[in-house]
Design a protein with these regions (language model features):
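Non-catalytic, surface-exposed connector residues within folded enzymatic/regulatory domains
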Residues: 34, 55, 70, 74, ...
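Structured loop/turn residues at secondary-structure junctions
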Residues: 136-139, 163, 229, 255
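Short glycine-rich anion-binding loops that position phosphate/pyrophosphate groups of nucleotides
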Residues: 191-193
Length: 301
């Protein structure tokens, strides 16, 4: 199954919850008036798009309708697709243009951080990259063992210390090992704690310092892993993490198990952070680059 087919199948619940409701609104009106926009905005809000983004989409739609002279509600779907694709367009590429590139993976426990690292390591190795993984989430019981299982499956090296060790020390060793082994990419797991923001911030700053001091020429990608099934809560998490880290991209997991896949839209619209990768299944090769146009086509097809 190609990725577009996987995406389409993964977005089925979201399509049923969001796109079909939008179609329902469109089909129930014979003209585009204020009632139409109100109904559409309410539908978007109820589909986890959030009040701010829903209002912005409807405002953009009003302008498009006026500019194009559209009077038939049936033509609105095409305009909506264009508006949503425009919102999602951004720097969706994962940059691996330095050797090594360092990827810091952050996110709360349970969002799918460890799984994402395993799948990303597998993807990169499959494309010919040499990968080293740093098990720097040293606080959560079993995090290191879990990551070991995934790196074994992906066939990549792991650098680990004992549970409770200093995460920055693990990252330091991983950078040194990565350079010695001529690695293309070093992926660093981090502790998934948000309840103590100061600790998290201090820890991420310390890790960033280690990276900057020991791999000064490396590009650093900081990826925030969010669970699509949590809906608006994912936007709130992203907002909090944005205050503590310089996030370069989002990885949205569990897109296949939720009707809340529309959450991608407010994350980009309200926070300005591009989605770079999406998880659409449980298999090791089910983490794929996010292509906005494919997402919109799969949603509204």
């Amino acid at each position: 199954m190609g990725f577009f087919e996987k995406l389409k199948s993964g977005l089925k619940n979201t399509k049923d919850a969001l796109a079909s409701k939008i179609t329902g609104v469109i089909n129930s009106f014979t003209k585009i008036d204020e009632d139409f926009f109100e109904e559409l905005e309410e539908t978007l809000i109820l589909s986890d798009i959030g009040a701010v983004t829903s209002a912005n989409i409807c405002e953009a739609l009003r302008k498009e309708v006026k500019a194009t002279g559209t009077t038939d509600p049936a033509e609105v779907k095409g305009l909506l697709k264009k508006i949503i694709a425009e919102i999602l367009r951004g720097d969706n590429e994962l940059y691996l243009d330095t050797k090594p590139t360092v990827i810091l993976v952050i996110g709360v426990n349970g969002a799918g951080k460890t799984t994402t690292i395993g799948k990303l390591a597998y993807n990169l190795k499959s494309s010919g990259k040499k990968v080293v993984v740093a098990a720097a989430d040293t606080f959560r019981a079993a995090a290191i063992e879990q990551l070991q299982v995934w790196t074994d499956r992906a066939g990549v090296d792991i650098i680990k210390h004992s549970e409770g060790s200093d995460p920055a020390a693990v990252v330091f060793d991983a950078i040194k090992a990565g350079m010695a082994r001529d690695a293309d990419v070093i992926i660093c797991d981090t502790a998934g704690r948000l309840h103590n923001k100061k600790n998290l911030m201090d820890e991420l700053k310390k890790i960033a310092r280690i990276v900057n001091n020991n791999a000064p020429d490396s590009r650093v990608e900081t990826l925030l892993v969010l669970d699509a099934t949590t809906g608006q809560n994912a936007v709130n998490q992203a907002r909090l993490f944005k205050e503590t880290a310089d996030i370069t991209g989002i990885v949205l997991t569990k897109l296949d198990g939720t009707a809340k896949g529309g959450i991608i839209i407010p994350i980009k619209e309200e926070l300005g952070i591009p989605v770079k990768l999406v998880g659409v299944g449980e298999k090791i090769d089910d983490l794929q680059p996010f292509i906005p146009q494919d997402y919109v086509e799969a949603l509204f097809e």
